Amino acid sequence: MATSVLLACGLNEQKLPGFVHISEESNVDASFLISCVLGQRLRISNAGTLLVCLQHHYQHYFNAGMRLGYNTNIFQGKTLGVIDVLSDMAGEGLASKWLTNTEGQTLTDQLVEDIRAQVERNYASRNSYTVLIDNLSILFNLGASKLQVQQFCQDLAALGKEREKLTVITKLSNSDIYQLTDNNVAKLGQVRIQVLRLKSGVFREVDGKLLIERVLDEGNYACEETRKEVLYKVNDRNVKVFAPGEIGVKV
């Protein structure tokens, strides 16, 4: 299952921090974290979740969920909402609203508008609400500028600040390439999880390293940052974590 990795990342609580950013290094796949968080949120009674599919379509998350022991179809349309950008574009082609400039709105403007509409429709009736954005990098591929992506994330962070029980979780792949954007987005939140390659290269028992950074508020003028490193291995039906050095791997 996914309990150990969520516990290591501090994402196993019913109430999550307002903004969490996942930085995915090149040649590393951090999609498992989105699937793990999704499953955890769906299991909480009356917790709402909105999944925004940019990198993978909804069916991918359904399949991943079944391997991790949960069925997204049971929750869809109830506590789970989905904005499946990828499937919309595949089904509608160039007619998709995500590929057209509607009334002068950019892609990111339209996406924020749809997310806000879903939140306003469902937030009040839920004990908590989580918005999952599976890969900001895809917005660059669809023509969004770095400034538009940054503004998109700022709008999402503002949405979270307006609502005490709302959490926004974003992921950015190739974070070492989009380093400036990645750092700017990470500064919007309280938790940053970096998914990194092993310095020693490929190892059969470990897929990579998680560096978890958390900012703890201490009044108006001071804060404390905690850092933790763990190794992880994604198996077919679970994700395991290890302490560095536990299995003799140099990181």
Swiss-Prot record:
Keywords of this entry: Cytoplasm, Cytoskeleton, Microtubule, Nucleus
GO BP terms: establishment of mitotic spindle asymmetry; melanotic encapsulation of foreign target; oocyte microtubule cytoskeleton polarization; positive regulation of insulin receptor signaling pathway; tRNA wobble uridine modification
Superkingdom, natural source: Eukaryota
Listed CDD domains: Elp6 (cd19495)
Observed phenotype of the null mutant: Larval lethal with developmental delay; larvae spend twice as long in third instar stage and die before pupating. Larvae display abnormal tissue morphology with reduced size brain, ring gland, salivary glands and imaginal discs. Larval neuroblasts have abnormally shaped nuclei. Formation of melanotic masses in the hemolymph of third instar larvae, increasing in size and number over time.
Keyword Nucleus on entry: yes
Localization, UniProt: Cytoplasm; Nucleus; Cytoplasm, Cytoskeleton, Spindle
Function per UniProt: Component of the elongator complex, which is required for multiple tRNA modifications, including mcm5U (5-methoxycarbonylmethyl uridine), mcm5s2U (5-methoxycarbonylmethyl-2-thiouridine), and ncm5U (5-carbamoylmethyl uridine). The elongator complex catalyzes formation of carboxymethyluridine in the wobble base at position 34 in tRNAs. Binding by the elongator complex stabilizes microtubules and promotes their growth.
Family: Belongs to the ELP6 family.
Stated name of the protein: Elongator complex protein 6
Gene that encodes the chain: Elp6
